[in-house]
Structures are given as structure tokens and as C-alpha cells.
Amino acid sequence: MKAQSHPPQTAITPALWLPYQLYKWLIIVPVLLLSTSIIGTMIIALCFLGLANWASRVLASLWARLNATVMLMQVKIEGRARLRPGQSYVLAANHLSLVDIYVLYGFTRLDLKWVMKQELRKVPVLGLACELMGHIYVDRSNSDAARASISKARERITDDMCVVFFPEGTRSRTTELRPFKKGAFRMAADLNIPVVPVSVHNTNRVLPSDTLDWRPGPVKLVFHEPIEITPETDIAALSEHTREIISNALKA
């Protein structure tokens, strides 16, 4: 079956089309820009004051929740109880849309460190704020530099901290999962911390890749059963098993 390149979005009736366009450009866009500038600047200041962890847990989460709310996203989280308090995890999630970050950061109540592409470092305010909070930039064009970044990430993991990977490496432009890269699974094996497959549903209906056509709608994030690491764990098999769990969840 051929993968769809653009999933159907939430329908907006003709009577609501113009009011929603006004809401989108007069409310959503200004809030996204202002919240990133203002909260990002506050985060940078707090990081210089030694409050990076608080800024990440509280202000960054507030930023994400605010933006998801103004975009009229109805967020549902499932499987959160599968995660043990005080345990670190590697979270491996599919990546459908830019708004995946809002869902993970704003609604999971977890202390997260992100592994993100190097290009985001250049985004004004946001790039510096993420770096100061301890998120990890990876140069996808340089495998040696990417491995060095992942090694640095290992040093930042403490109890109750989770590292978020999008193992596809970029947003999927279709309904099919891309092949998974192995960095997340090598880190989990090296640190002996469980991998949690995370399936993100319907965010590409709220904001498809490569567009600014926001639509209101429900989205869902599911934490699947953690996969424990053992001395016999095979990296390739772990990667494929995680991908299979997420793929099956997306097709269900």
C-alpha cells in the first residue's frame, strides 16, 4: 500500500473558515512568537543564575503547554503509569510534526533532555535556551561529531531524567515510519537504562510537515511497556523491536 504524504486534517466548516483564519494569524502566530521570545529569554537568564533544571522543568513545560493550548490541541496521554518514579529512561518516539515537542514537553510531567539536530542551535533565543538547559545537539552530517554528542549526553543523565530521541532522525512526511538510527539504543545499552517506545498520534493532522496550516484537533501520546536492557541485548534487535511496537500502535 502506498503511504499517504498528507494525512487528512480536521475539517473546518465554511462558516468557521474565516474566523479560524483570523484566529490563526492574529492569535496563534503572535503567541507562538512572543512566548518563545519571552519565555526563552527568561530561561536563558535563569540558566545563567544556576537554575537550568528548574527552567527546563517549569518554564519550558509552561511554554509547550501554552502553545499547545492556543493551537486548540486536545492532548491525551496514555501509559504514564508504566514509568517508575526515580528511574531514568531513553524515550524513543516517532516524529510526525513540529508540535510533537509541545506534547512531550508540556504534558508528560517528566524531566527531559532532548537530542536534536544541530540546525536548531541557530534559531534565535530558542537555540541558546536549549543549549543552556543541557539539551544535546547532533550534527547529522558528521557521524564522528554525532557520536561525540551522544557520549556527552551520557554524562548529563541523572536519576529521574529521561532522554528523548526521535530515532527516525527527522520528521516523517508519510504515514510510514522511517528506518531507525541506532544512537538511542546504544546509549540505553551503555548506561543500562530501559528504552520506552513512545507512539505519537495525529500531530501531523494538527500541523503537517512543511506547512503552517494549523488545525485544531485531538492528539495522543502513548508510553508503551519499557524494554529492559540485559547483557545479551542486541542493539539492532532492540532498535527493530522498538520500531515494531510503535509501528503497530500507529496502525491500530
Task: List each language-model region with its residue ranges.
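Non-catalytic C-terminal accessory region of glycerolipid acyltransferases
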Residues: 1-15, 19, 147-252
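Catalytic core of membrane glycerolipid acyltransferases/transacylases, capturing the structured
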Residues: 39-62, 68-71, 78, 84-143
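N-terminal membrane-anchoring alpha-helices
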Residues: 1-76
